[in-house]
Structure formats: structure tokens, C-alpha cells
Amino acid sequence: MNWATMDDKPPANRKGPPRSEIHAEQGKPIAPPTTAGEPRGTLLALWVEERGESECPAVMDGIRAETLPDAKAGRLPRGHSWRDNLDKSLYGGKQMTAMDAKAFDAGAPSRAAQMWDRANWSDIEAEVKRLQLRIAKAVREGRWGKVKALQRLLTRSHGGKMLAVKRVTENRGKRTPGVDGRIWSLPAARRKGMLSLRHRGYRAMPLRRVYIPKSNGKKRPLGIPCMRCRAMQALWKLALEPVAETLADANSYGFRPERSTADAIEQCFNVLAKRASPEWILEGDIRGCFDNFSHSWFLENIPMDKEVLRKWLQAGYIDEGTLFESQAGTPQGGVISPVIANMALDGLEAAVDASVGTSTLVRRKAQLNVVRYADDFVVTGVSKDVLESRVLPAVRQFMAARGLELSEEKTRITNIAAGFDFLGQNVRKYDGKLLIKPANKSIKSLLDKVRGIIKDNASATQEALIRQLNPVIRGWAQYHRHVVSKVTFSSIDSHIWRWLWKWAKRRHPMKGARWVRQRYFRRDGYRFWDFATKGSTEGDTCGLQLFRAATVVIQRHVKVRGLANPFDPAWDTYFARRRTAKRSARLPGATPWC
């Protein structure tokens, strides 16, 4: 039945005026007629699709979601409509008025803002998670046609688009614009941005090139997408992440949900701590990893919409007003870049194992283990010869297929007795005992940053200085709290105290040491030299205090299981217990979690 050719006239067996005559004056949306024996939900879908795509994707999603149950029931429940279903799924069961519906379709800013704030995010996240679980299940079953269909369903769903916009407008980069200079800070702008996430006619805008300093003094280039491209990438990340997690290497820990650098360091301890553990380590360094990935490899192997992926990869970037083409690589700064980079490097463990043969006994004797965090990785081996003659050529071949190469200067093979640095930690055996401590480079970087803050705030108030120092010291200490770092923490506190004493003395050259001490240092229990402001009330000796790294409790980290998948329902109980144990460990006086 083609309603588009009937000029909106009802069938002969239907009484009453055409629906086209009952319209905006009543403040209600136009709906197509129904015929006896045909489900209304099915007719709604046919009527809207044949007349062209609705101006509001939410309408289409509500109609399509309603079609399946209607086909079984034969008709809608009395007193219900597709608007009611849309209200219940997105707005927590609140009834949408005629004025709300008109504002939703027309995009009125005030009403759109209210409806964005009224969205039931828990239900939206649950619906997206259900689709992600179905995608992961299809991957495990090898049903790639179903994977593609479910990805298409998720990336075109109203809930998926809303969640994608929510994530890019609430993360740390929400106030960083792209080349168009726009940010979606208001609810009305977010809703409008959500409606713009359409695949038909989508064009990726060039990236805005910015540079951030590296630890070696050089600068790292970042590509900042515009908000619409960012939201589109976040939308596809929702659909691609279940695939990536299901196919990922067991000992890959970078930019993955429920994993961290602490898991990678703990895996190093697990494979190197025993006396019979391998003693040789290959430290791998990929030259310009994110800048040199092969676009052709991505397009051939990443299971997503190829046209959308090609537009992202070839969008180019603008640097100082000049447009540059992108011939290779994926931009650092893109929402989806870590996911596709991880997928490109997955398979490294299998390539390393295959380098010594197919025999399980031979592999076990070679003692090969791979620990990878994004583009940083180490490989253990029983001897230097095995790593040099077997493993290293296999790794080079693996990287070459993806357009990458190892850095000859930074890739080296070392003995565990000499130690190696990995993710800011130094891993080394002392007389047969493995100790993991903060790396000297990491310590120097922290002290240089603290010294710079103190120097730049020579004339600032004590309170302003403390507020700048505390996040830096606390963040560094929290990162290193899982390794042997208690002595290091005390040493750092000592250095910082001496610099602050000089800072205080320099501000008052005509005052004595006793006066300076009483002005800037307070007593806290048995401590007489805490750098702190004066208390605001009587009896309160200390106000705002400088955070001391030595107060951080050392806690042994429990590594996540290698095969644990957050998109597999079989692991839900495991992750729930793990999150509960982590929260409990943060409470005062809590014991290390396990």
C-alpha cells in the first residue's frame, strides 16, 4: 500500500475527514490512517518511510521499535501510541504533551533543553549495553553478518546518538573546539548535535592541529576533531568496542575498559618475580606509531562502515591556517583512535608465539610473554639469542604489515639484573629479588614540575600555591602507590619542603627564621613543620595543608584476569565484585583489596 500516491486521503471504508485536515491548529502531530486488519504500527512505519525520512529521528526510532510488538498483537493497546512508547523509553515514563511534541520536532531551544535534561540516562545506557552484548556474542559465534547488522542498528538508534553526545560533552575535552570553533555546552545545542548524527551525506571536517610537550622536550602533535565528528566517532566507538574487547590480546592493557597501567605493571611482576622466570627482556619502541598506521590496513581489517572510516582517516588537518592531507596514521586526539590502534596491534602475542614454532613444549621452554600498553610493549625470553634471532624479526614483520617500524635507537634487549623502565616504573632484580620502583625519569619529571610551580608563584599567596601543588603531588603519588615507593615518597616530600622554606624566606628577607616558621608552617599532631595556612576557627591550628606523598598508603594491585570481557555476561559478577572491592579499599583504614 502506497500512501504517498493517495494524497493523504483515507480509504473508502474509513469514516471522517482526512488526517491532513486535522493538524497544527490542535497542536498534535499528523498521523496516517489505519485500515481494518492491518496493525497500526506497521502502517506507521510504511507511511513515514514512503513519504521520506522524518525530520526527527526519534519519531522513526519510536515507530520502528513499535512495529515488532504490534505485528504480534495486531493492534496497539487502547489509549497508547508510539509517542507513549518514546516517552517511556527516553523520558522515564513522563507523558509528553502536545506542546512538548511540537517543540521536540521543531527544535525550540527552551523545550529542547528541558527534554534533554529529562532524558532517562540509565534506561538509555542499559539499552545501548544490551546491543553491545549482542554484538560481542555475535563476534564470539563468528556471525559477522549479524555483527554488521547490530552495529548498523546501534549507530542509527536514538539512544546511541544521545549517549554519544553525552559522552563527548561531559569529558575533559568538552570545552576544546575544533576548526569550526563550536562547542555544545547548552542542552539545546546537544540535542541539535544529536539530530545531526546522520550517515547519509556525512562529511568529516579537518582536524585542528595542536602541540603538547613531551617528557624529552619535544612536542607531540594532536588532532582535535570538531564536535560533530567527535560525537560520530563516539557513536561508532560504542559499536566497535565490543568487537575490539572480544578479539583483544589477553595482556593488552592500554585504553581498554576495566584495565589500567597498574594491571600491566602487575603482569610484569607475575612473569618476572620467580627465580625460574625469564631473565631477558625485549623493550619495543614503535617509531611514530599513531602517525604511520597504514590506512589500507585499517580499511581492510576494521569491522565498521568503510566510508565513514575513510572520511575520518583522510580528513586532513589545519596547522597555522594551512590545510594538510593525511596519507597515513590516525590522529592522536580522536575519540576512536585508541580503539582502532589497539585492534591493529592485537595479534602481537600470537606472532611472538609463532616465532619459535608451533610446539607447545618449545614455546613453554622459550618463556615468551608479551605485556603491551597501547604502543609500549615488552617481550620476555629465556635467552638473548631467542629474542634477537627469532622474536625480533617476527615483531618487525608484524609491524611492517601495518605500516609501522621499530626504532633502532630505542629498541633493545636487556637483562633483568640491569632492569628496564616501563610505564614510569623501573623493573629490576636485586640479588634475585624483583623490585618495582618509580623510574628516575618519572621522579625527575615530578620534581621539575613542582620546582617550576614554586618558581612561577614567587609572589602568590600561600593558599594559591598549595592549591596548585596538591593535585600534582597527589596524582603522582596515587599513580605509584602500587609499587615499592615509600622511600621515594619521603625523599620527594623532603625536596619539596626545602624549596618551600626557601620560598618563604625569600618573601621576607628582613624576618627571622622563627617568624617565618610561625607564619607559614603549622603543627599537625606530632608534626611541627607542615606547610599550611592558618586555621579559620579557634582551636583549628591548620587550614589548607600541602599534601604529603608519604601519607599515601602502599597497596598491592590485583591484576584483572586476562580473558575478562566487560561485554560478556559471564564476567558480570567478577567485575561487580572487583568494583566493590576497589571502593572498599578507598575507605579509611581499609585493607588492600583482592
Name the predicted role of every residue range.
Residues 1-191:
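Non-catalytic, polymerase-adjacent accessory regions of viral genome-replication enzymes
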Residues 2, 7, 22, 66, ...:
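Right-hand nucleic-acid polymerase module
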Residues 186-204:
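Amphipathic alpha-helical blocks
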Residues 203-215, 310-325, 467-470:
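Active-site-adjacent bridging/hinge elements
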Residues 402-476:
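A conserved non-catalytic segment of reverse transcriptases
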Residues 493-499, 504-593:
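Extended C-terminal regions of large enzymes
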